[in-house]
């Protein structure tokens, strides 16, 4: 998490935008078996300029963010690429990887919930609205998972909430 803080502090000079939000932590969804941990995720991060060299896949923007779990269980840092699709109303799918802080014992309330690996896939999607030229609000979903590559047990972990983003340029 310290490295994440340094990256976020150093990044805004080259970032297209910074963002932050609050998301419900470890939400139980029809696709996952969440709800083992309580609290919220406090997220802060930045997104860079579009990568023109990756134009053949839509010129995504790099991002990095840290997520602090208020319940004290599983904090994580993630990095990846995302695509902003649309105008004032937009969708932003993203693909990334995350490293989390949870102990490897994988047992909470006598239920096996291991995440399978310290490093996980971290897909995300948000739906947003550009409030002004510099400010946008997003409804965001972030999923952590090893995609059953490391074991058959893969409950994953979902966070769902709201983010605000601020364009620096």
Task: Name what the model sees in each region.
Residues 42-48, 79-85, 95-97, 125-131, ...:
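Residues on the lipid-exposed face of transmembrane beta-strands in outer-membrane beta-barrel proteins
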Residues 22-27, 31, 94-124, 128, ...:
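Outer-membrane beta-barrel translocator/channel fold
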Residues 30-32, 65-67, 109-113, 147-151:
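Extracellular loop and loop/strand-boundary signature of outer-membrane beta-barrel proteins
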Residues 36-42, 73-77, 119-123, 156-160:
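Residues that define the transmembrane beta-barrel architecture of outer-membrane proteins
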Residues 11-16, 49-60, 85-91, 134, ...:
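Short loop/turn motifs that connect adjacent beta-strands in outer-membrane beta-barrel proteins
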């Amino acid at each position: 998490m310290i490295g994440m803080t340094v990256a976020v502090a150093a990044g805004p000079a080259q970032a297209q935008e910074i963002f932050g939000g609050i998301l419900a932590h470890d939400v139980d969804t029809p696709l996952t078996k969440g709800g083992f941990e309580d609290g919220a995720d406090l997220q802060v991060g930045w997104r860079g300029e579009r990568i023109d060299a990756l134009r053949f896949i839509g010129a995504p923007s790099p991002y990095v963010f840290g997520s602090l779990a208020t319940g004290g269980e599983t904090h994580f840092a993630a990095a990846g690429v995302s695509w902003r699709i649309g105008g004032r109303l937009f969708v932003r799918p993203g693909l990334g990887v995350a490293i989390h802080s949870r102990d490897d014992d994988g047992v909470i309330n006598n239920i096996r919930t291991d995440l399978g690996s310290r490093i996980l896939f971290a897909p995300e999607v948000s739906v947003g609205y550009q409030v002004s030229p510099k400010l946008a609000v997003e409804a965001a979903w972030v999923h952590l998972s090893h995609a059953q590559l490391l074991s058959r047990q893969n409950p994953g972990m979902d966070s769902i909430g709201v983010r605000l983003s601020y364009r620096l340029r």
